[in-house]
Amino acid sequence: MPKPSHVGWLAKVGKTLKTKDGVPIEIWQLNHKPDADVLSEWAVHFRNHYCDDKQIDLLRKGTRLTRSEYLVNLKFPDANIKPGPSIRSGDFAEILVADYVEYILKFWVPRIRYADKTMRNESKKGSDIIGFRFQQAGKSSREKQ
């Protein structure tokens, strides 16, 4: 999958913090731009974490719901009823961090967590984000690719 355009809005602040153990932590921020094309692409990217566009018609079959109604009423966390807004915010942040890990740090990040949610207003239990870096012949897995 090509790098989504919104990932270009992520930028290092140029400041670092340190953990209690003295490990440096880079600070990044999202420099949002009012670009309708990038926002539309990002919306598709976000939506596809919950329900792949290629599967939505099959999944909503028999529900009598439009695509939009299916997503809003059955897949996405509720926008207004608690704890939906906090779940929505957390999901958004996790997806953005997964994009950072995959497209900036160059790890492979599985993207099935949100599609498998059984309760739309509940966080999926388990690992939030995991990234894999695969070994290439002749390199140890600790070497950057």
Feature names for model-found ranges:
Residues M1-K125, I130-Q145:
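Mixed-charge (Asp/Glu-Lys/Arg
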